[in-house]
Structure formats: structure tokens, C-alpha cells
Amino acid sequence: MNVYVTLKTKLVAELRQIKQTLQTERNIIRVLRRKLKQIAAQKRFIKFLPKLRYLPTPVTKIEQTARFLVKKFVDPKMKYPMDSIYDKKLSRQSKKVAASRKKKWQRLEKYLGGISNMTKIKEKQIANNVAIIIGQQEEMNAVRECQKLGIKMFHIVDTNCNPGLADHFIPANDDARNSIKFILGKFLTRIRLAHKIKVKFKKTSLKK
């Protein structure tokens, strides 16, 4: 009986050790995978860097654009200038209040940051833009704003959408992730192609 108890105790101890080792190995693998993904993202970003000069971005804002791209695609935990501003303004507040306010500010920046500089854009420049609307019913405010500003709209139209509100529409399931990814991929390919043609046309016109 004592032999049985001793064997059982040893077996339990060995199993616990194996479990701990496996957990440690899993954590190491998880960290390595994260690092490999980060390295792959950094490589993609380095390849993309030379293309920054072709973006319709002023030279003074290229650094800001690069930081944003690094934060979005390479290292989401990287401190962004806006985050440092938040931290500076909230340094005297309690942790709870600071976290709550920072969350609210980040939410406002997320949803309104894109239109914060639109007041500086001329009316003709705004009208030259195009909006791609996915989920028409949820984005009716955006649709109305585009109509007011004269921005042309491409709608991904599902069975519960009104195609009459769109300048151009694509019948598709706006809830299916793969469907949206495929359509946006096609859009991106054509936009890049058009941008390359535009750059080449500008270069040839300057040579003449």
C-alpha cells in the first residue's frame, strides 16, 4: 500500500512538472510567434517606406504618417504622439479618472480624427474624394454628409439597403468578412494602379 501511495505521489509530481514545462513552452512559443509577426510586419513596412513619397501627403507630415503606419501595422503598443499628449494632460489626475478620460478622448479621435482637418480642405478638393460605404443602414450619417458635400459614394449593397442612395453600388453581402475583404482588395488594386498612372502622367507632363 505504501509503495502504491509513493508511486502515486511521484506520478502526480511528475505530471505537474510536465504541465508546468508545457505551459512555459507555450508561453515561449506565443512570444516567439508575436516577435516573428512583428519582424514580418517591420520587413513589409521597410519595403513600403520608399513609396511614402508617392502618397498625397505634404513633406512636413510624412514623419507623422510613418509613425501612424508603424503603430498600426508594426507595433500597436508603440507610444503615439497623441498618447503622450493625453498622458501629459492627465498626469495630475487619479489613475481611474485618467484612464476613463483617455478612453473617451481616444474614442473621439478614432471616430472624428479623420474629419478634424476637413475644414482646411477646399470645397472642390472635398468633391474630388470618394467614399466607400459598407453597412448602409448603420452609416446613414456618413451617407448624408457625403450627399451634402458632394462626395461620390460606392455602396456595398445588401438586401436591406437602398441602392438609390448610392452613386455606384455593388450587390454583395455586407456582413460576410471574406466578401468585403475581396471587394476592398479589388478597390485597392485599382486605386494603386490609378495612382501610378497619375504619377507617370505628371512626370511625362513635367518633362514636356
From Swiss-Prot:
Keywords: Chloroplast, Plastid
NCBIfam families: rpsB_bact (TIGR01011)
Family in the record: Belongs to the universal ribosomal protein uS2 family.
Source species of the chain: Chlamydomonas reinhardtii (Chlamydomonas smithii)
SUPFAM superfamilies: Ribosomal protein S2
Listed InterPro entries: Ribosomal_uS2, Ribosomal_uS2_bac/mit/plastid, Ribosomal_uS2_flav_dom_sf
Main location: plastid
Family annotation (Pfam families): Ribosomal_S2 (PF00318)
Transmembrane segments: none
Domain of life from the UniProt record: Eukaryota
GO molecular function: structural constituent of ribosome
Compartments where located: Plastid, Chloroplast
KW Metal-binding (keyword) present: no
GO biological process: translation
Annotated protein name in UniProt: Putative ribosomal protein uS2-like
GO cellular component labels: chloroplast; mitochondrial small ribosomal subunit
